[in-house]
Structure formats: structure tokens, C-alpha cells
């Protein structure tokens, strides 16, 4: 496939190595299918044709030129420039280089056309051709002046005599990237024409010129390349992707080489070839119907068509007839259905074909109603689309100057690669946006209004290359707002435009859209009139759209783009849309854009100059940072009443009305100071509470560092949060984002930030598909006061918006808008999106105020509960109150929750006395149930611990256990509550517990939980309360000391009891030391007796061990080798007085050799070794061997 591309007036014929149907020709045979390089260099510099297997594209980072290829020195710098132009990411490899046809679809789609949305209509994906173009080697720019005389480079010449001519004459990319070049072709200037004048007629001013401007023609070249290799190409029509008849191909090409370009024979051949493939999908191929006939003259100022062109297109003289002819091929309704709209005579440009692409836009002439937000709405009515371009009340060029200047003033600092802008300059010269591709005004398809989008939108905010998705039909969400603003600003003279001028301007839009010409980054003033006129026609269509909707007329469908950026910066793409269905409809930001004061003043001055009338700043599309919008402006009724420029307005406005908001307020009604639309308009009541101020107040950063995120830094306090508002989600991470009463474009810094700020959106903006992780803006309740910005917090305010309007919550066409995190955003795990993101560490610096509305959910989550606990410890009283207000009503639910109970406990620890008492009131009536519950018992314990005991609520809580003491004592949870009651409550209030223990002391002492309660009673109760308990204990001492639980009660008495109680227990032990010491549980009691008994009682117990005999051995020997009793012997050695200790050691000496055989005997020897070494005594024969075996 040979394709010709003009790059900044340089011509190159190159062979696509990705085309599998090409064959390799022998060296020396010059054929148009081979790469022919034209040069003005010396004759004789013969370069052999490069075979297809080695025609690697030189621009790719992994491609390298081979010997004799087109590569030259300085290629790496040009590669960097090409990468800069086309945003190729590092590491992206050109797929299929040198591999024949196997390389298709191996690389990322960089210039997708959207054709792959309709797979059944796809002939050849434009992505592949665009990818090939992107990989084209841009090695040089010098072509000489050989094309300036009008010579066609595709004509036959004797180039084989002079050898190949190379255009790669060295590196000439030294000047500014988008700067002035030598005689390049720029965007043709589109100006208004007199009626009946064709586009191809050259006249003084009213003609289409292609002058030698000072701006690059890169965009023209790109579209030339894309369209020349479109599916309408005869090569593809005949060969598609399959193998071709090589011989026939060669004969065909050689035959064509000997003919003139526009000869009638060739034109006939082209038509025959086109007819053979036009119906490849059962649909006529309109775009590129004569693909080989070049429609654009490369010679500056030469736009005359040849006779063949006139013969080909001369029959189309009436614009409406031509449009009907094109649209009816798609099965559209005849134009007679819209008889109410006058049909003007429109002459189509014979240079460029106008028509829809049936490969992509195969839509039926009907609307598809849907009743859910997830379903797409078929909103492009291609049958009545022409009517939008035949409205008589078009706008003039000058009326869009104000909106353009305001938009450029706001986004000037965002053009990072354009050096002419600075922070404080007013927008004097307009620089069109880089590569705005087919953004669509209302009522048109995305292919037909790329220029209109550029005129109304201004510089692009977020490059579509960042997301790697198809950019066709993608536009920022404030496109509607800007169009409506421009329409209202120019509405005072819209009705005064004559019909011929309107039709001329609309022709221009249609013509430009049909040719699919993307805008290049540096079109100069010559393209400004084009932008202005195109914008005027776009706003005219918006007016017609608004009028039709307000009047309820049929045939005015709503706009549903295939993809666009919503107000949060999220790219909404409906990839699953079927034929006839557009994308999901999302609400756009309704209010004005905040700009700096200097830029606002410049914009106001420009608006006043363009509108020739009073221009107010209050209701304009832009507002100053330090200005407040007035409460309302009366709109007097006039004789010339037009429909409101609002898209969804039903109010009647004077021609001098200053309101240019998206949602205009009704006449004479006061507006809302915090919103851009009135509360009494068609959508005011509903959207006031549903939408709120979904604004993005980007901080006015003054830093000039080139960091990737410096456009969202928080170095300014202009947007400091007021006391009545709450910081939105993500404020801690993007701390430069705050509240604003009027939303603006996401990611667009203010002009004072300078050109160094990055256009790259935050990383989280593309991580969740159609919704981002950043909640920008606040929520208002309809009166201008901010309410909680947390997800779900708007639910209780939605009841106020019950009006049955288009955007009401009950509407099936447009679901009501909600915040980024709503209570209905439930993830598959059952958690809300906010909690899920928090659990995934997406909010490392989340604050309590940012989860308002989700406190209950967080409290019942493991990580969320821990987060709240940690925050409550250091929270301010206001933050604690915020949390407390949400948990109070459901306090009992949290008290019995596995994680929520900890939040309640934290309030008992760190909350105010009022909060503690309020929670205690929630416990009242549920003490027993909570005491027996695993988690509720902990809450009651905290309440008993931290509420002052003199509070009446404590006594009331404890009294609820009366009659259920034993049940609670024997319960694994309730016993802790009873213990805490005994510890914290005044003993006088616990008499009912003592009374309940009567005759139950032994049973409770041997109970695993009751024994603990008995010990607490012995520790904290009054002596008169513990006496009956001790009496019962003494009666069962012998049994209790051997019980696995009762022994703890006896030990507790020995440790904390009165001396007389200890003596009673020691008396029970004497005489049974040997037996009890060998008992697993009683041995512990014997140890406590030796430790806590008096000196006399201790000596008696030790003497009993030393003098008692156990059969042939002494009791001491038996105890030393016993697994339990040896600890009693060790304790005796430790606590015995020196004289008695010496006696014990002399008793142990005869058994040293034997004790070494026993595991437990070694413990005794180690104890002896310790004392003898400590005291320096010589053990004599008692000592072990020198190696110190222990």
C-alpha cells in the first residue's frame, strides 16, 4: 500500500511494511508500489529501494535504520520531537515492523477512530493506519520550493533517470517546535460568502484560501494521511487484508502511471473500483468515495478544481438535496418530515465530500428510551441532524470573542509546551488547543464538529493520550456550559443575522466536519476566524436545541456522547453501547468557572466590546475569585423574546438578558448566590439539593517546580474551608482542593500558576472507570449552605427535591446525581466504595470529618473501627461530637458489634461527661442482655469504670442485675460485669450481690467464673460484707485447697486476708504438708502458706518437713524428687531464716548423689549451689564434680 503524506510541505512516498499484500520487486525496477524518495540533492545519489522486510519505521524506539534506508544523522532528536508530538509512551514498541502482515494490532491504539465500536461494520481499523502514521519517520523538513508551482507529486515523471530523491536533507528541527516554518500550508481561512458562491471559486475576500502562513501544517498533513488511507481507498477495497493478485496489481499501477491525475478515464476507473467495494457492508461508503482523487490542493492559494472534479460533483447544487441524498442512503426519514424549518440553498464544496460514515454511524432514525442510568440513550438523530445546520439565526464571528477570550484566559497557564503565555498576561493572541478531535456540540455527531469544539472549548484540559482510550466524541463536561454561555452572550443579535450568512457559516461547519481535520497545536490568527464562525454555528445549533426542548417539539434528541469527561475529571466511556445507542448521560457542572481577578476583568472587557452592550460579571460563564454573585437580577420582558440560551431553560428572556448560565433562572426570580442556576427555574429546585456545588476549587499554587502533581498543591489559602463546610473526600491527599460555590474544569490550574504546571490528572482519576476516587466540591441543601460532603449525606435532603422535572430522582431518563461515595455505592464485598478504598490504603490520611455519614459503617468494620478509635483519642471536641451524633441513635447496635463496641468504649474513655451519660442512658434497660453478651459486657465495664460512681445512672444500671446475680456470675461474660461492679461501684450499692452469695460460696468458689467474683468481693467489699463469705470458705478449706478453682480463693485469702483468716488456713494445712505438697493444686496453697504465714507458723511447717519420715526415707527426700513438692522445698529454702536454712541443707546433703538422677532433684541442687557460692561456703563432699553438673 503506497500512501502519500505531506508533512510541513515535505513529500514522501513510503511503503507500508505492514501491508501483507505487497510483493518485493527486484532492484532497479521502479514501480509506484516501491518507496520513492524525492530529493533535490546531487544527481547520482542512488539509493536502492528498501525491501518491505526491512522497512522498519525509523521513529520507533526499537527500530533501527538498515543500510541504505531512510535513516540519517540526528534521528534521535527528531524521534524525541515526534514522541513529544504524539505522546508515545516510553517502551512502546511498534508492532509488526519487518514482519509482514503479522504485526497488526500488536501495539497500543494511539489514534483510534471509534470504528471498532461497531465491529460488524469494520473494513479496516483506522487504529492501524493511525499507528502507521505515528511511526512515520519525520527525518527532515526541507523540501525546497518544488511544490510551490503547483506541481502534483503523484504525476508521472522521469525520476528513475535521476535516481531516488531524498527529502531527508539533515536535521532542520532546530527552531521552536511549533514555530514559524518555510511556506507551509495552514488551515484554510473560512470566511462568509455571498449567496450562490461556490467554495471552489476564487475571489477577493469571500473565498477559501490556503496562504503561506507562519504556522505549521502538521494537522492538515495528518488528516491527509489518515483520509487517503481510509477504508475508502481503492487498494483496500479491492484487496482488503487478504492476498492480492500481484500481477494484476502491477499492471493496474503501471497503467495508471501513464494517465493524468484527473483524466476522465481514470475517474471512471476509480468509480468502477469504488462501486466494487462500496457495498462491502451492505452500506454505501460515503466518506472517501473517490479515495484516489486528491481533494486538497497542495499549492498555496490554488483551490481551483479540475474539470473532472466539477463533473464529479457539479450535480450537487442544493445543500438540502445533497444532504437528503446522503442521509437517505442510511434509511433515514425524508426531509419533508421537518417542513417547519426552511430549507436554504447550500452549495457543497466540490473539493471535499460531505457525509456521515456509515461504518461507524449506522443509526436508525429513532430514539431509544431507557429507564436506568447504566443504559445508554440513543440521542443522535441523524435524519434531522441537517436541520441543526439550517437554522437561520446563526451568530456572527465577533459574538464569540468574549467566550473565547475568557476560556483562553483561564486555560492559558495550562499550555505547558507553549512559551508565549505567562501567568499575568491577558489573552491577546489565541492559541488553539492541542488536538481536540471531534468534540460534538448538541445535536451533532462527534465526527462533524471538531472545529466547533475547538472554538467553544479552548485549550484542552486533559489530553486524551493520558488515558489510552478512543478520543472520538470525548469532550470535557463544561462544553455545554461554554456553548450556552456564548449563546446567551450573543443572543442580543442572533435574530438579526441574515439567512445567507447563516447558511454560509453552517456550510463551513459541515464541510470542515466532513473532512475530519484535527486542529494542530499552533494555528495562528488565520484559524481564528474559522474557530469563531464554527463556534457561532455550534452555538446556533445549541439555541435550536434549547428551543426545541423547551417547546416540547419532536425531533430534538438529547445529546449522549460516546465518551466524555465528567465534572470530576473521570472519563466516562460507554464501551458496551449497541448500535443506535449513545453513551450514558451524566450531569455537567451547572455553575460558573472561577478565574483570577485580572483574567476576569480582561474577559469582561472583551465581552463588553463584542456584545456592544452592558455585560455583567455576575451571571457570566466566569466569576472572579473574590466576587460574590448577586442574589438575583430581574430580567425585564421585552418585545424581542427569545427562548432562553439555557439548554434546559423554560424561561422567557429579553434579547439584552445577561444570564448565560447553563441552567437559567426564570424571569424576575432571584438566583442562588452559591449556584449558577435559579431555584425557581426548570431544574433549580431539584438540582439545588441533588447536584449542589460540585465544584473543583483548585488551589492557587505559586510554586514553579516541574513536579507531576504541583498543579494540585495547597500553597494558597484562597480556598480555606469555612466553618460551615466540610472537607470533601480526598482533601488530605489532594490538600489543595477545597470548596467552591462555582465549579470549574477539573485539572485546570488558575492562570497565576504559570506554564510549568502539569496537565496530567491525579493518578486516582483513572483508577475506577467511570468514577474517580476524588470527591470534588460540596453539597448544598438548596439554600446555599454547605452540608456534609460525605457519601450518603445527601440522602436525607433529597426529599426536598420532589418536583417532577427532567432530572428529578424519580426520572427514568436522567438518574439523580450523587456524590462520589454514596450509601448506594455498595461494592461486591458489601462495603461502600469509601470504606473499600480506605481498606485498600487509598486514603492514608483520612480524617474523621471526611467519613461523616459513614461512621456506623466504619465502626462495624475491623479497620474502620480501629481508625475511629485512634482518631477519637486525639480528636477535637467538635470531631468527637460529629462521630457521637451518628452513633448515638444506634448505640445499642454498636455495643453488641464485634468491632463497634470498641468505638463506644472509646467514648466512655475520651468522651465528655455529657456524652458518657447519654450513652449510659442508652444502656439503661439493657444491662442484663448486654452483660450476658460477648461485646456488650465490655461496654458496660467501660461505663462502670469511667462514669463517676456518684452518678445516679451507675446505681441504676447495677440495680438492673438484682435477681440475676448468680446467672451473671456463672456466665462467661456476665461474671466480668459483676466483677467490675464490685471494683468500681460503691460497696453500699452491692449488698444485693453479697446477699445472693449466701450458702453459695463453696459452689461459686469451685466455679471457674464464680471463684473470680469471690476474690473481687474479698478485695473490695467492706469487712462486714466479706465475713459471711469467709465463714463459708473456712468450712470448706480442705476441699477448696485441692480444687482446681477453689485453691485460688484460698490463695487469695492468704495473700489479702486478715491474719486470723490466714492462721485458720495454715492450721488446716499443718500435719498434711507432705500429702498436700504432692498435690497439683494444693501444692500452690502450701507455697502461699510458707510465704505468707507468720514466722512461727513458717518454722513449724519447715520443721514438719525435716523431721517427718516417709517410709524408709525422710519426707524431705520424697518432696525433693516430686514434680510438685520440689517447689515447696525450694520456697522453704528461700524464705527460711538462716539457722533453719542450714538445718535444711544438712538434711539434703546425704541425698546429693541421688538427686542428680532425678529431673526435679536437680532443681534442689541448683538452689543449694546458689546459696553456697553466694555465701562462700565450702560444700565439701556435698559439692558436685568440677564440671558443675546441675
Swiss-Prot record:
Present in oocytes (at protein level). Pumilio repeats lie at residues 850-885, 886-921, 922-959, 960-995, 996-1031, 1032-1067, 1068-1103, 1107-1146. It is found in: Cytoplasm; Cytoplasm, P-body; Cytoplasmic granule. GO terms for molecular function: mRNA 3'-UTR binding. SUPFAM superfamilies: ARM repeat. It comes from the Eukaryota. Interacts with cpeb1-a; interacts with unphosphorylated cpeb1-a but not phosphorylated. Component of a complex with papd4, sympk, tacc3, parn, dazl and cpeb1. This is Pumilio homolog 1. It comes from Xenopus laevis (African clawed frog).
Amino acid at each position: 500500500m503506497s500512501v502519500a503524506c505531506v508533512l510541513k510541505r515535505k513529500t514522501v512516498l513510503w511503503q507500508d511494511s505492514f501491508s501483507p499484500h505487497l510483493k518485493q520487486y527486484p532492484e532497479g525496477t521502479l514501480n509506484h508500489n516501491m518507496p520513492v524518495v524525492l530529493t533535490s540533492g546531487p544527481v547520482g545519489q542512488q539509493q536502492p529501494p528498501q525491501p518491505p522486510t526491512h522497512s522498519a519505521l525509523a521513529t520507533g524506539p526499537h527500530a533501527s535504520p538498515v543500510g541504505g534506508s531512510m535513516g540519517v544523522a540526528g534521528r534521535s532528536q527528531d524521534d524525541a520531537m515526534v514522541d513529544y508530538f504524539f505522546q508515545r509512551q516510553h517502551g512502546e514498541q511498534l508492532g509488526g515492523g519487518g514482519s509482514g502482515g503479522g504485526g497488526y494490532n500488536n501495539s497500543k491504539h494511539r489514534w483510534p477512530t471509534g470504528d471498532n465500536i461497531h465491529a460488524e461494520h469494520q473494513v479496516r481499523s483506522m487504529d492501524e493506519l493511525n499507528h502507521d502514521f505515528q511511526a512515520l519517520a519525520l527525518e527532515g523538513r526541507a523540501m525546497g520550493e518544488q511544490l510551490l508551482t503547483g506541481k502534483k507529486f503523484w504525476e508521472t515523471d522521469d525520476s528513475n533517470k535521476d535516481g531516488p530523491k531524498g527529502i531527508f536533507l539533515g536535521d532542520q528541527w532546530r527552531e521552536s517546535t511549533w514555530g514559524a516554518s518555510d511556506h507551509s500550508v495552514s488551515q484554510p481561512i473560512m470566511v462568509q460568502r455571498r449567496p450562490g458562491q461556490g467554495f471552489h471559486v476564487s475571489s477577493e475576500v469571500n473565498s477559501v484560501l490556503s496562504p503561506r502562513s507562519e504556522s505549521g501544517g502538521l494537522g492538515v498533513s495528518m488528516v491527509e494521511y489518515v483520509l487517503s488511507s481510509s477504508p475508502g481507498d481503492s487498494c483496500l477495497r479491492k484487496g482488503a487484508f487478504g492476498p492480492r493478485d500481484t500481477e494484476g496489481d502491477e499492471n493496474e499501477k503501471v497503467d495508471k502511471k501513464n494517465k493524468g491525475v484527473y483524466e476522465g478515464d481514470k475517474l471512471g476507473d476509480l468509480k468502477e473500483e469504488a462501486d466494487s467495494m462500496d457495498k462491502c457492508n451492505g452500506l454505501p461508503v460515503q466518506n472517501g468515495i473517490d479515495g484516489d482523487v486528491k481533494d486538497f490542493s497542495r499549492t498555496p492559494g490554488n483551490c481551483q478544481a479540475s474539470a473532472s472534479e466539477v463533473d464529479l460533483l457539479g450535480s450537487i447544487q442544493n445543500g438540502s438535496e445533497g444532504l437528503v441524498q446522503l442521509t437517505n442512503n442510511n434509511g433515514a426519514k425524508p426531509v419533508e418530515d421537518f417542513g417547519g424549518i426552511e430549507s436554504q440553498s447550500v452549495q457543497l464544496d466540490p473539493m471535499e465530500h460531505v457525509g456521515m460514515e456509515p461504518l461507524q454511524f449506522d443509526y436508525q432514525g429513532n430514539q431509544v428510551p431507557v429507564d436506568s442510568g447504566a443504559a445508554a440513550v440513543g440521542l443522535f438523530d441523524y435524519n434531522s441532524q441537517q436541520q441543526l445546520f439550517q437554522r437561520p439565526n446563526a451568530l456572527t464571528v465577533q459574538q464569540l470573542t468574549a467566550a473565547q477570550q475568557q476560556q483562553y484566559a483561564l486555560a492559558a497557564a495550562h499550555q505547558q509546551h507553549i512559551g508565549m503565555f505567562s501567568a499575568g498576561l491577558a489573552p491577546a493572541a489565541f492559541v488553539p488547543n492541542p488536538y481536540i478531535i471531534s468534540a460534538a456540540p448538541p445535536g451533532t455527531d462527534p465526527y462533524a464538529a471538531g472545529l466547533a469544539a475547538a472554538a467553544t472549548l479552548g485549550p484542552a484540559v486533559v489530553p486524551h493520550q493520558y488515558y489510552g482510550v478512543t478520543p472520538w466524541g470525548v469532550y470535557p463536561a463544561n462544553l455545554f456550559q461554554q456553548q450556552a454561555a456564548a449563546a446567551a452572550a450573543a443572543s442580543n443579535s442572533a435574530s438579526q443575522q441574515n439567512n445567507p450568512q447563516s447558511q454560509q457559516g453552517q456550510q463551513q461547519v459541515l464541510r470542515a466536519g466532513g473532512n475530519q481535520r484535527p486542529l494542530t497545536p499552533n494555528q495562528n490568527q488565520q484559524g481564528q476566524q474559522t474557530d469563531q464562525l464554527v463556534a457561532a454555528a455550534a452555538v446556533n445549533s445549541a439555541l435550536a436545541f434549547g428551543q426545541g426542548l423547551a417547546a416540547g417539539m419532536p425531533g430534538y434528541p438529547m445529546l449522549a456522547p460516546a465518551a466524555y469527561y465528567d465534572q470530576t475529571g473521570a472519563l466516562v466511556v460507554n464501551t458496551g453501547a449497541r448500535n443506535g445507542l449513545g453513551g450514558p448521560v451524566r450531569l455537567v457542572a451547572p455553575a460558573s468557572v472561577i478565574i483570577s481577578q485580572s483574567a476576569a476583568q480582561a474577559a469582561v472587557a472583551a465581552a463588553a466590546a463584542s456584545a456592544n452592550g452592558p455585560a455583567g460579571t455576575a451571571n457570566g460563564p466566569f466569576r472572579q475569585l473574590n466576587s460574590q454573585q448577586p442574589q438575583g437580577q430581574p430580567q425585564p420582558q421585552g418585545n424581542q423574546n427569545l427562548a432562553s440560551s439555557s439548554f434546559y431553560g423554560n424561561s422567557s428572556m429579553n434579547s439584552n438578558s445577561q444570564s448565560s448560565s447553563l441552567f437559567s433562572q426564570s424571569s424576575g426570580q432571584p438566583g442562588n448566590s452559591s449556584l449558577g442556576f435559579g431555584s425557581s427555574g426548570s431544574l433549580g429546585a431539584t438540582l439545588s439539593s441533588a447536584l449542589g456545588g460540585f465544584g473543583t476549587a483548585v488551589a492557587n499554587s505559586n510554586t514553579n517546580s516541574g513536579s507531576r502533581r504541583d498543579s494540585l498543591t495547597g500553597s494558597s489559602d484562597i480556598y480555606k474551608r469555612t466553618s460551615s463546610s466540610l472537607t470533601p473526600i480526598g482533601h488530605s491527599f489532594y490538600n489543595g482542593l477545597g470548596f467552591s460555590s462555582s465549579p470549574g474544569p477539573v485539572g485546570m490550574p488558575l492562570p497565576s500558576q504559570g506554564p510549568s504546571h502539569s496537565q496530567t490528572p491525579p493518578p486516582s482519576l483513572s483508577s475506577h472507570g467511570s468514577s474517580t476516587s476524588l470527591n470534588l466540591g460540596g453539597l448544598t441543601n438548596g439554600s446555599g449552605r454547605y452540608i456534609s460532603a460525605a457519601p450518603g449525606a445527601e440522602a436525607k435532603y433529597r426529599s426536598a427535591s420532589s418536583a417532577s422535572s427532567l432530572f428529578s430522582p424519580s426520572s427514568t431518563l436522567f438518574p439523580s446525581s450523587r456524590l462520589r461515595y454514596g450509601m448506594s455505592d455498595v461494592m461486591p464485598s458489601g462495603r461502600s466504595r469509601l470504606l473499600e478504598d480506605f481498606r485498600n490504603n487509598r486514603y492514608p490520611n483520612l480524617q474523621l470529618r471526611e467519613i461523616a455519614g459513614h461512621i456506623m459503617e466504619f465502626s462495624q468494620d475491623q479497620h474502620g473501627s480501629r481508625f475511629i478509635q485512634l482518631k477519637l483519642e486525639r480528636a477535637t471536641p467538635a470531631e468527637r461530637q460529629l462521630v457521637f451524633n451518628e452513633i448515638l441513635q444506634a448505640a445499642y447496635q454498636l455495643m453488641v458489634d464485634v468491632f463497634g463496641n470498641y468505638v463506644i468504649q472509646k467514648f466512655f474513655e475520651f468522651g465528655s461527661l455529657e456524652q458518657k451519660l447519654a450513652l449510659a442512658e442508652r444502656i439503661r434497660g439493657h444491662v442484663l442482655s448486654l452483660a450476658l453478651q460477648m461485646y456488650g459486657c465490655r461496654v458496660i465495664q467501660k461505663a462502670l469504670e469511667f462514669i463517676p460512681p456518684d452518678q445516679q445512672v451507675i446505681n441504676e444500671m447495677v440495680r438492673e442485675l438484682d435477681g440475676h446475680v448468680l446467672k451473671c456470675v456463672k456466665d462467661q461474660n456476665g461474671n466480668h460485669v459483676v466483677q467490675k461492679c464490685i471494683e468500681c461501684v460503691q460497696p453500699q450499692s452491692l449488698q444485693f450481690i453479697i446477699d445472693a452469695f449466701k450458702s453459695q460460696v463453696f459452689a461459686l468458689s469451685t466455679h471457674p467464673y464464680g471463684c473470680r467474683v469471690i476474690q473481687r468481693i474479698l478485695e473490695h467489699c467492706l469487712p462486714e460484707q466479706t465475713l459471711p463469705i469467709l465463714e463459708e470458705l473456712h468450712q470448706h478449706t480442705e476441699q477448696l485447697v485441692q480444687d482446681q478453682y477453689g485453691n485460688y480463693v484460698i490463695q487469695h485469702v492468704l495473700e489479702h486476708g486478715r491474719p486470723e483468716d490466714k492462721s485458720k488456713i495454715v492450721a488446716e494445712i499443718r500435719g498434711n504438708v507432705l500429702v498436700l505438697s504432692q498435690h497439683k493444686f494444693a501444692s500452690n496453697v502450701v507455697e502461699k502458706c510458707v510465704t505468707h504465714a507468720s514466722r512461727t507458723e513458717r518454722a513449724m511447717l519447715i520443721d514438719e518437713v525435716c523431721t517427718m519420715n516417709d517410709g524408709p526415707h525422710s519426707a524431705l527426700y520424697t518432696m525433693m524428687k516430686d514434680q510438685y513438692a520440689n517447689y515447696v522445698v525450694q520456697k522453704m529454702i528461700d524464705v527460711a531464716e538462716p539457722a533453719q536454712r542450714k538445718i535444711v541443707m544438712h538434711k539434703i546433703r546425704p541425698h546429693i548423689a541421688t538427686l542428680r538422677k532425678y529431673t526435679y532433684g536437680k532443681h534442689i541442687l541448683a538452689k543449694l549451689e546458689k546459696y553456697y557460692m553466694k555465701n562462700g561456703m565450702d560444700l565439701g563432699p556435698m559439692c558436685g564434680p568440677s564440671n558443675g553438673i546441675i
